[in-house]
Amino acid sequence: MTNDEGMTKSEDRGARNDESFWDDGAALVREQPETKRVYDLEERTAGFGEAIIDFAKAIPQNPITNRIITQLIGAATSVGANYAEADDAVSKRDFLKSIGTCRKEARETKYFLRMIVRAVPELKPQARTLWIEAKELHPIFSIIWRNK
């Protein structure tokens, strides 16, 4: 059984738990709410990977953050790479495998953003924006995966 975003009850519960970490009591507003959303998923996922790379450059490097940075960049850029692979899949099975990986990597990206905020709390506002994008990508891939 799935909710309106195509998530199972356990996924939805996990998403709500994730959101509580980010809730600082203030209403959150996107930096540019008037900007047009990108509906080309290949472009959107590539832009997401690029934004994560730019964010990672601002993270101070130390023994703790170095490992998280590597994991974060790997997970976030894998979302777009696997979407591109799914787009060129030669079989339904290959397509579903790649889309399933996109889902997992989007969720993993949210996790590593949370860990970066724990290690470098002053980066929370920038990490929050990226976390929201990862949160939006996950149900998109869930719906694609379930409907194919």
Regions found by a protein language model. Give the residues of each.
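Amphipathic alpha-helical assembly/interaction segments
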Residues: 1-148
